Amino acid sequence: MWFKVFVGDIMKFIEVMEKRHSSRDFKKDEVSEDTLREIVKIACMSPSWENSQPWNVYIATGETLEAIREAWIAENGKKIKGSADMNPGHRTNFSERGQKNMADFMDAIGKFDDDEDLENFNHVQHILFNSPAVVYLTLPKNYTKWSVYDLGGFGMGLMLAATDLGVDSIPAYELVKYPYILRDNLPIPEDEDIIMGIALGYESDEHINEYESPRLDLDEILKIN
């Protein structure tokens, strides 16, 4: 009996992992506050270094998010370069394999979409993917690398919780590249760095949402000795 229950739980988790993918355009349907709270509550079960739980979470919805979106569109329209609190670095800072994967991703997007779709792909980023809610994850300034690791686990837990509750998501640098706009509209203090944004909502029927990026073969990343 225990074995059957255990296998059932594992299969459910695998299904959630397989279902989660980056949704690049959302419907206007709102995500209820109760659902948002439940998503974050589940993510709070994530582990951290000596239970430090270094994360803080801010969610923009409604008029607040629309004010952010309007300012975002204006900055993008002026081609203002992003200046995120956590420097993303240059592509050359990534490993050769990482650089190849990123190049392959952009090439695949170009082949997947026609010119009109590709233009929409770029446009929806600048309007925050049309999302009705954006989660912003922060860390105290002078955070350690372990805290970044912990926050990554928290973010993944949050997206898996969202998936399990029927809510789609996408984590993106685009969502945090103008931190001054976020601080103008959210109670994020200067002694916290805005590390990542995760858009939440319900996926639209746009063609771009059909794209799913491939994963490396297991033997390319795994060594068992």
Regions found by a protein language model. Give the residues of each.
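Acidic, surface-exposed loops and disordered segments
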Residues: 2-225
